[in-house]
A protein has these predicted regions:
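A residue-level marker of the well-folded mature domains of exported/periplasmic proteins
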Residues: 1-183
Length: 183
């Protein structure tokens, strides 16, 4: 809905389940809004290498991507330099890249921590998988959208989907497989 070229580039750190599921969730949402969209995907095999991330993003932009999913730092810098848009990840970097960050998928780790600490406090703690509490349905995630950059119909569709996730009428498919490029 925002991409004019129908090509979105995605640069990730490592192809691990926690990263893969974020990328797949974004891909599913983008495809729901625009069934013609295709993806270019690359992993850096590094958690922090902004120059490498930037070069990967430049290559994707040169291959036609006009929106970048910035799972790593450096990607939004490439988007700024080439006049493209980006989606942020984990934290909201819109103030660092004004006019570039369409939205950021935010992680609220407090929901997970509160659940675990609450279980310790009430004596019910067990070694368990608390990862579900990092999901939007449990207030572990949200979106920060720049409404000046994202069309109103897209903002409305996102708000409706977020409400459906929170009330349980839509369940996000968790896909831990490594995402790959469409072309």
């Amino acid at each position: 809905a925002v991409s004019e070229s129908n090509v979105i580039g995605m640069v990730g750190g490592y192809a691990i389940p926690e990263v893969n599921r974020l990328m797949h969730a974004f891909m599913a949402g983008a495809r729901e809004m625009n069934s013609d969209v295709t993806f270019l995907v690359n992993f850096l095999d590094s958690w922090y290498d902004p120059p490498k991330a930037k070069e990967s993003a430049f290559a994707m932009i040169d291959a036609g991507a006009d929106v970048m999913y910035a799972e790593r730092f450096g990607v939004a810098d490439a988007a700024v330099e080439r006049g493209k848009k980006a989606i942020g990840n984990v934290i909201d970097t819109a103030n660092d890249y004004p006019g570039t960050i369409l939205a950021s998928a935010l992680w609220h780790m407090e929901a997970t921590i509160d659940k675990a600490i609450g279980a310790v406090a009430d004596g019910s703690y067990t070694a368990d998988d608390y990862s579900q509490y990092s999901f939007m349905a449990h207030n572990g995630g949200s979106l920060a959208i720049d409404k000046s950059l994202v069309p109103a119909n897209v903002v409305a569709a996102i708000a409706a989907k977020e409400a459906a996730i929170r009330d349980g009428s839509f369940v996000v498919t968790i896909n831990d497989e490594t995402p790959v490029s469409d072309n």
